[in-house]
């Protein structure tokens, strides 16, 4: 009887030992971290510093649009431990159960993040449970100043979006090269905003208006690119790009460093560009979430955040990093926007899958010329 009475207790003890033993094993992750991030979006020695400090080997793959990232996450088994989607796409991924919640006890440097950035992310991620900002910026127009002025034969329009969405302007620029981002979620909201419609409209009729405008300018777009346009601007192969603010500044810096003679400038639209907040997330099936938390926490150190901004000309979410940022970057008005200009920017919004599909069809028709 006594032996029999102890069997349940023995089983319970074995279960507890197994549970805690399994937890200990889970914490002993392989010294590897797989990251999937945007191209041209990290400081030169940031990965090397993390690897040296932690002994974790980073495998770092690149993408150039949110559509690719989302498709991979939906398919599952990406093999990645950190992915960097924009916040409005991450909202879809949260809703779809594709991400795992952050363990904030492993992220003490979250205290360094600007509350205003956290508030922006909370619009997509209530309670800031899944997303941490990597960096942010805005979608705008970048130009080769000398070539554009020569092609126009006069001054720039007051509304810089006229350069790309009015045939009378863009038709004059075709000869020196016009590039658009190869992404429905960038170009369609931009033209909707230009037309005075909600950039992330839920009204199908607005997309018909966008399609009409895009069709009128299609003959004058010579390139669709979400990464290669940086070098194309720097070497003078194109004179205008609808692109991201930091990328256009990278092109400017490469032109300076390479002494190519190209005068590249990111423009700040008076009626606003499209803000984006790129976020670090951990896929639901990530194999090394502990290593992922270590990297996220590392990125939120002021000196590390500054190293990223100094290299790629995008603002980071850590205010204390400003003292580590080079003066030429800190004083660049297209990197750190003036409050009035920031107020005119359009904040990101989420769309359901039906509206996403309509946006994709609108862009595909534009790109193919159909």
What are these regions (language model features)?
Residues 27-93:
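Early extracytoplasmic/lumenal segment of secretory-pathway proteins
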Residues 84-90, 94-220, 225-234:
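Extracytoplasmic ligand-binding site segments that recognize negatively charged/polar headgroups
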Residues 89-92, 240-261:
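A ligand-binding cleft/hinge motif common to bilobed small-molecule-binding domains
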Residues 100-111, 131, 162, 258-274, ...:
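Short beta-strand->loop
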Residues 142-147, 193-196, 276-288, 307:
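A bilobed periplasmic-binding-protein/Venus flytrap-type ligand-binding module shared by bacterial periplasmic
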Residues 207-216, 222, 260-281:
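Periplasmic-binding protein-like
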Residues 231, 339-370:
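Conserved C-terminal helix/tail region of periplasmic/extracytoplasmic solute-binding proteins
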Residues 283-344:
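Mature extracytoplasmic/periplasmic domains
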